[in-house]
Amino acid sequence: MSRVAKAPVTVPNGVTVTQNGRQVEVKGSKGTLSFNLHALVELKQEEGKLQLAPAKESKDAWMQAGTARAVLNNLVKGVSEGFERKLQLVGVGYKAAVKGTVVNLNLGYSHPIDYALPEGVTAETPTATEIILKSANKQLLGQVAAEIRAYRSPEPYKGKGVRYSDEVILRKEAKKK
Protein backbone atom coordinates (compact mmCIF):
# COMPACT_ATOMS: atom_id res chain seq x y z
CA MET A 1 0.00 0.00 0.00
CA SER A 2 1.44 3.39 -1.02
CA ARG A 3 2.02 5.86 1.79
CA VAL A 4 2.65 8.59 -0.79
CA ALA A 5 -0.87 8.32 -2.21
CA LYS A 6 -2.44 8.82 1.23
CA ALA A 7 -1.06 12.36 1.60
CA PRO A 8 -3.24 15.03 -0.03
CA VAL A 9 -1.86 17.57 -2.51
CA THR A 10 -2.44 21.13 -1.28
CA VAL A 11 -3.45 23.57 -4.01
CA PRO A 12 -2.22 27.14 -3.33
CA ASN A 13 -4.23 30.26 -4.20
CA GLY A 14 -3.99 31.20 -7.87
CA VAL A 15 -3.79 27.58 -9.05
CA THR A 16 -6.81 25.88 -10.62
CA VAL A 17 -7.14 22.16 -11.23
CA THR A 18 -9.71 20.93 -13.76
CA GLN A 19 -10.51 17.34 -14.59
CA ASN A 20 -12.02 16.27 -17.89
CA GLY A 21 -12.42 12.50 -17.80
CA ARG A 22 -8.91 11.08 -17.31
CA GLN A 23 -7.23 14.37 -18.36
CA VAL A 24 -6.13 16.62 -15.44
CA GLU A 25 -5.13 20.21 -16.25
CA VAL A 26 -3.32 22.49 -13.78
CA LYS A 27 -3.20 26.26 -14.45
CA GLY A 28 -1.13 28.81 -12.56
CA SER A 29 0.97 31.94 -12.92
CA LYS A 30 3.89 30.05 -14.55
CA GLY A 31 1.79 28.28 -17.18
CA THR A 32 -0.52 25.35 -17.85
CA LEU A 33 0.42 21.68 -17.50
CA SER A 34 -1.63 18.52 -17.97
CA PHE A 35 -1.34 14.76 -17.61
CA ASN A 36 -3.49 11.66 -18.00
CA LEU A 37 -4.64 9.76 -14.92
CA HIS A 38 -4.17 6.00 -14.94
CA ALA A 39 -7.37 3.95 -15.18
CA LEU A 40 -6.72 2.50 -11.70
CA VAL A 41 -6.60 5.94 -10.01
CA GLU A 42 -9.43 8.25 -8.89
CA LEU A 43 -9.06 11.97 -8.11
CA LYS A 44 -11.24 13.75 -5.55
CA GLN A 45 -11.19 17.55 -5.15
CA GLU A 46 -11.98 19.13 -1.79
CA GLU A 47 -11.52 22.78 -0.78
CA GLY A 48 -7.85 23.50 -1.50
CA LYS A 49 -6.79 19.84 -1.50
CA LEU A 50 -6.57 17.00 -4.00
CA GLN A 51 -6.87 13.42 -2.80
CA LEU A 52 -5.84 10.48 -4.96
CA ALA A 53 -7.07 6.96 -4.26
CA PRO A 54 -6.98 3.63 -6.06
CA ALA A 55 -10.13 2.70 -7.98
CA LYS A 56 -9.89 -0.82 -6.56
CA GLU A 57 -7.86 -2.38 -3.74
CA SER A 58 -4.82 -3.90 -5.41
CA LYS A 59 -1.08 -3.43 -5.10
CA ASP A 60 -0.79 -2.09 -8.65
CA ALA A 61 -3.59 0.42 -8.06
CA TRP A 62 -1.85 1.77 -4.94
CA MET A 63 1.44 2.06 -6.86
CA GLN A 64 -0.24 4.00 -9.67
CA ALA A 65 -1.98 6.25 -7.12
CA GLY A 66 1.36 7.07 -5.47
CA THR A 67 2.95 7.88 -8.82
CA ALA A 68 -0.02 10.03 -9.87
CA ARG A 69 0.13 11.92 -6.55
CA ALA A 70 3.85 12.67 -7.00
CA VAL A 71 3.32 13.85 -10.60
CA LEU A 72 0.32 15.98 -9.63
CA ASN A 73 2.26 17.55 -6.75
CA ASN A 74 5.09 18.44 -9.17
CA LEU A 75 2.59 20.00 -11.60
CA VAL A 76 1.02 22.13 -8.84
CA LYS A 77 4.44 23.24 -7.56
CA GLY A 78 5.66 23.90 -11.11
CA VAL A 79 2.81 26.21 -12.16
CA SER A 80 2.94 28.13 -8.87
CA GLU A 81 6.68 28.38 -8.07
CA GLY A 82 8.52 26.78 -10.99
CA PHE A 83 11.68 24.69 -10.94
CA GLU A 84 15.30 25.56 -11.69
CA ARG A 85 18.46 23.55 -12.29
CA LYS A 86 21.99 24.95 -12.22
CA LEU A 87 24.81 23.56 -14.34
CA GLN A 88 28.51 24.38 -13.95
CA LEU A 89 31.12 24.14 -16.69
CA VAL A 90 34.50 23.11 -15.27
CA GLY A 91 37.52 23.14 -17.57
CA VAL A 92 39.89 25.46 -19.39
CA GLY A 93 38.03 27.28 -22.18
CA TYR A 94 34.64 25.78 -21.31
CA LYS A 95 31.96 28.45 -21.61
CA ALA A 96 28.30 28.93 -22.41
CA ALA A 97 26.18 31.73 -23.85
CA VAL A 98 22.42 32.02 -24.40
CA LYS A 99 21.06 33.58 -27.60
CA GLY A 100 17.26 33.51 -27.55
CA THR A 101 16.23 29.87 -27.28
CA VAL A 102 19.66 28.48 -28.19
CA VAL A 103 22.42 27.66 -25.70
CA ASN A 104 25.86 27.94 -27.32
CA LEU A 105 28.41 25.65 -25.63
CA ASN A 106 32.19 25.58 -26.04
CA LEU A 107 33.28 22.34 -24.38
CA GLY A 108 36.74 21.64 -25.77
CA TYR A 109 35.61 20.12 -29.04
CA SER A 110 36.78 21.42 -32.42
CA HIS A 111 33.34 22.96 -32.94
CA PRO A 112 30.85 24.85 -30.76
CA ILE A 113 27.63 23.06 -29.79
CA ASP A 114 24.27 24.80 -30.28
CA TYR A 115 21.54 23.28 -28.10
CA ALA A 116 17.99 24.41 -29.00
CA LEU A 117 15.85 24.69 -25.86
CA PRO A 118 12.39 23.11 -26.07
CA GLU A 119 9.29 25.20 -25.51
CA GLY A 120 8.67 25.77 -21.81
CA VAL A 121 12.34 25.89 -20.75
CA THR A 122 14.34 29.11 -20.38
CA ALA A 123 18.06 29.51 -19.77
CA GLU A 124 20.31 32.26 -18.50
CA THR A 125 24.05 32.52 -17.98
CA PRO A 126 25.04 34.76 -15.03
CA THR A 127 28.68 33.86 -15.74
CA ALA A 128 30.31 32.18 -18.73
CA THR A 129 30.75 28.95 -16.75
CA GLU A 130 27.27 28.70 -15.23
CA ILE A 131 23.89 27.89 -16.80
CA ILE A 132 20.58 28.28 -14.96
CA LEU A 133 17.65 26.42 -16.52
CA LYS A 134 14.08 27.29 -15.46
CA SER A 135 10.77 25.62 -16.25
CA ALA A 136 7.35 24.78 -14.82
CA ASN A 137 7.70 21.18 -16.03
CA LYS A 138 10.07 19.25 -13.74
CA GLN A 139 10.39 16.25 -16.05
CA LEU A 140 11.26 18.37 -19.10
CA LEU A 141 13.73 20.46 -17.07
CA GLY A 142 15.57 17.35 -15.88
CA GLN A 143 15.66 15.96 -19.41
CA VAL A 144 17.16 19.18 -20.84
CA ALA A 145 19.74 19.39 -18.03
CA ALA A 146 20.74 15.75 -18.61
CA GLU A 147 21.08 16.29 -22.38
CA ILE A 148 23.34 19.33 -21.88
CA ARG A 149 25.41 17.43 -19.28
CA ALA A 150 25.78 14.47 -21.68
CA TYR A 151 27.77 16.60 -24.16
CA ARG A 152 30.72 16.49 -21.74
CA SER A 153 29.99 14.59 -18.54
CA PRO A 154 32.49 15.10 -15.68
CA GLU A 155 35.54 12.87 -15.78
CA PRO A 156 36.92 11.41 -12.52
CA TYR A 157 40.58 12.48 -12.76
CA LYS A 158 40.43 16.27 -13.07
CA GLY A 159 36.66 16.76 -12.70
CA LYS A 160 36.39 18.56 -16.04
CA GLY A 161 33.02 18.65 -17.77
CA VAL A 162 29.44 19.84 -17.31
CA ARG A 163 28.07 19.06 -13.86
CA TYR A 164 25.03 19.86 -11.77
CA SER A 165 25.80 22.50 -9.13
CA ASP A 166 24.94 20.09 -6.29
CA GLU A 167 26.73 17.10 -7.85
CA VAL A 168 29.75 15.57 -6.11
CA ILE A 169 32.30 14.05 -8.48
CA LEU A 170 34.14 11.05 -7.07
CA ARG A 171 37.78 11.69 -7.92
CA LYS A 172 40.35 9.04 -8.80
CA GLU A 173 44.05 9.22 -8.15
CA ALA A 174 46.33 9.24 -11.19
CA LYS A 175 48.50 6.20 -11.87
CA LYS A 176 51.86 6.34 -10.08
CA LYS A 177 55.13 5.13 -11.56
Curated annotation (Swiss-Prot):
Family indicated by similarity: Belongs to the universal ribosomal protein uL6 family.
UniProt keyword annotation of NAD present: no
Gene name as annotated: rplF
Record key words, sorted: Ribonucleoprotein, Ribosomal protein, RNA-binding, rRNA-binding
Transmembrane annotation, as ranges: none
GO cellular component terms given for this protein: cytosolic large ribosomal subunit
Superkingdom field: Bacteria
Designated name of the protein: Large ribosomal subunit protein uL6
GO MF annotations in UniProt: rRNA binding; structural constituent of ribosome
Function, as annotated: This protein binds to the 23S rRNA, and is important in its secondary structure. It is located near the subunit interface in the base of the L7/L12 stalk, and near the tRNA binding site of the peptidyltransferase center.
Entry coiled-coil feature ranges: none
NCBIfam families with a match to the protein in the record: L6_bact
Complex and partners: Part of the 50S ribosomal subunit.
Organism: Acinetobacter baumannii (strain AB0057)
PANTHER family: 60S/50S RIBOSOMAL PROTEIN L6/L9, LARGE RIBOSOMAL SUBUNIT PROTEIN UL6M
Classification lineage: Bacteria, Pseudomonadati, Pseudomonadota, Gammaproteobacteria, Moraxellales
HAMAP family tied to this protein: Ribosomal_uL6_B
GO biological process: cytoplasmic translation
PROSITE patterns cross-referenced by the UniProt entry: RIBOSOMAL_L6_1 (PS00525)
SUPFAM superfamilies per record: Ribosomal protein L6 (SSF56053)
